[in-house]
């Protein structure tokens, strides 16, 4: 894996009245720090079957690369990663199958590990996709599973993405979220610091580009809040360590300095599976019997 590349964001002198902004004060004086933003951004799509993950990934990429169709059964079978250049950055988009299903099976466990490998060393943003007007008990279970699988801290890197934005019929998404009587949705929006945006996945041209710009503003906000860092946990750290070890061993072999007896992929994937299993058990214990 390549090291993260960063670009420096020049600091401007803000207007005097902004010096009293309580949000900036609580964030630790971001204006006083030299901020970093990575050139390569990893965005991983999460959500229940039928939420529109793959279609949203296609909208972000500006082309149809992930299979997407209306179906009650999962269309995406395995995690996939595709990328595009946008505004001087490389956006890596990882589409996932229903890895947050409450029915954990060996197949789901393997799919989780595959998603971790594809998004290593960690995602800069998790895009939690849900259909407008359809935030149900199943979505609440997805939110809980997201925390069980990746850790409670993952919500600090999560953006709520509503699909079928066109159903607002010209109305405001802000008004919809603010006025919702769905308490679980309202709680989640507040927990995510109101990081939400909407996608009409049939949009083209400027409308599609405007949606992406809005999403990337939310991603940029996450980068500021986390000083440019991606999300990581034990499973991601283990994966990255193995990537680096493999690269080092391959380099030594090519230079005639090492042994060709490199541990196989199956061996370290078994280790990843065990670490992930233990992490999920710990996260589940931490969450206890909370509502989400």
Swiss-Prot record:
Q: Which residues form the AIG1-type G domain?
A: 38-240
Q: Which GO terms describe its molecular function?
A: GTP binding
The record lists the organism as: Homo sapiens (Human)
Q: Which residues bind GTP per the record?
A: 47-55, 68, 164-166, 201
Q: Where in or outside the cell? A: Cytoplasm, Cytosol
Question: What is this protein identified as?
Answer: GTPase IMAP family member 6
Q: Does the keyword Nucleotide-binding apply?
A: yes
Gene this chain is encoded by:
GIMAP6
The family assignment reads: Belongs to the TRAFAC class TrmE-Era-EngA-EngB-Septin-like GTPase superfamily. AIG1/Toc34/Toc159-like paraseptin GTPase family. IAN subfamily.
Q: Which CDD domains does the record match to this protein?
A: AIG1
Lineage of the source organism?
Answer: Eukaryota, Metazoa, Chordata, Craniata, Vertebrata
Primary location class: cytoplasm
On tissue specificity, the annotation reads: Highly expressed in spleen, lymph nodes, lung and placenta. Expressed at moderate level in thymus, kidney, heart and digestive tract. Weakly expressed in other lymphoid tissues. Detected in T-cells.
This protein's GO cellular component annotations are:
cytosol
Disordered: annotated span: 1-39, 250-275
Keyword field: Cytoplasm, GTP-binding, Nucleotide-binding
